[in-house]
Design a protein with these regions (language model features):
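Boundary at the C-terminal end of the N-terminal hydrophobic targeting segment
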Residues: 20-25
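Catalytic-core signature of thiol
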Residues: 26-349
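Positively charged n-region of N-terminal signal peptides that target proteins for export
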Residues: 1-7
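Sec-dependent N-terminal signal peptides
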Residues: 7-16
Length: 349
């Protein structure tokens, strides 16, 4: 879904081509080079430097803070590097509290949504990157790595949430906060930035953006169009309301937004065939691709994702694409084929 400025906002993805390792590597590589798409930049809005979430499920924090950094840059001309770990610290405690309150019926995981970042800024403020320990450094790494962190934290939260006790104590919160602080750092009450002292709240207010100016927009038919509803996915655990508009209007909003200089925090799905870590997702017509690639249905479904991507990439610009419809989008959401597994910052066309 999209966290968007009320008036306008953003979009675009870029694609490279992935290569594959197989007996036909040379042949496939030649085909890829011949058919490689060439992209023309139509619009590229200003963004801050790209950060690496590494082995942490914090795409929602990195992408949405990047979005807000772009908003600040557009509005004030100033470049900031805001702390993802500050937002993660606050959000994980809130999510654990909700999981316990709901006796485990709200999931507890590394993931989140763009709204989690907006909520954190509104309720807890924000700090610059250097006001917290650098991601990964508290565990001897140079980048965030949440493997051990959540191996410890998840069963801790589940033990409390699924407790058979008739009454639980409040001690679990201080214990959990200690775990969070140990792995990603304590959140400061005060800090100095460019010679001036701030609290997280006063620093957030100094950034020059109005946090009430942002909304979430989506498009599904199981709720009335032009109404608001909470999108039913696990990482949308705060249940914020999204404006529901037809898919065609959603696309128009994006096109209009990016061409007017805005960017967007986008929550989407990168698990479909045709989306690789090195490229842009292309909505391939899989039935036609199977035929063009000389692969029958049974063999196609037995191929690994990387093997499928090699075949898809070899077709390149000749690969047939579907024309997405509102019904396709809805069907894929209803049957779990499409979900909300990755947050991105879209900034151009």
């Amino acid at each position: 879904e999209k966290l968007m400025k009320k008036t306008l906002i953003v979009a675009a993805m870029m694609a490279l081509v992935a290569t594959g390792a197989s007996a036909k590597t040379a042949k496939d590589s030649a085909a890829i080079a011949k058919n490689k798409p060439v992209f023309t930049v139509v619009k590229q809005n200003p963004i801050t430097s790209i950060k690496d979430q590494n082995r942490s499920g914090t795409c929602w924090a990195y992408s949405t803070l990047s979005f807000f950094e772009s908003e600040i840059l557009k509005k004030t001309g100033k470049t900031y590097d805001l702390s993802e770990m500050y937002v993660a610290n606050k959000t994980y405690m809130d999510r654990a509290t909700m999981a316990v309150r709901m006796h485990g019926d709200v999931s507890f995981s590394q993931g989140g949504s763009a709204y989690d970042v907006l909520y954190a800024l509104q309720h807890y403020g924000i700090v610059p990157e250097n006001a917290m320990p650098a991601p990964g450094t508290l565990t001897g790494d140079s980048l965030a790595n949440f493997g051990e962190f959540f191996d410890v934290m998840t069963p801790y939260v589940e033990a409390v949430a699924k407790s058979k006790a008739k009454k639980i104590s409040t001690a679990w919160k201080s214990g959990l906060q200690g775990i969070i602080d140990s792995y990603i750092g304590e959140t400061p009450e005060k800090f100095t930035y460019e010679g001036k002292q701030y609290t997280p709240e006063t620093f957030c207010k100094s950034l020059g953006i109005n946090l009430d100016d942002y909304v979430t927009i989506t498009s599904y038919t199981h709720h009335p169009m032009w109404s608001k509803f909470a999108v039913e996915v696990q990482d949308n655990w705060r249940w914020p309301l999204s404006y529901n508009v037809p898919m065609e209007d959603l696309c128009k909003i994006i096109d209009n937004a990016v061409n007017n200089g805005y960017t967007v925090a986008w929550g989407g799905d990168v698990t479909e065939d045709g989306f690789t870590r090195k490229g842009l997702g292309i909505a391939y017509d899989v039935k036609k691709v199977r035929s063009m690639a000389g692969t029958d249905a049974d063999r196609w479904f037995k191929l690994s994702k990387s093997e499928k991507n090699v075949k898809l990439d070899s077709l390149g610009v000749n690969a047939p694409e579907i024309v997405p419809t509102q019904k396709m989008r809805q069907d894929a959401f209803d049957n779990w084929e499409t979900t909300d597994d990755h947050g991105m910052h879209i900034y151009g066309i």
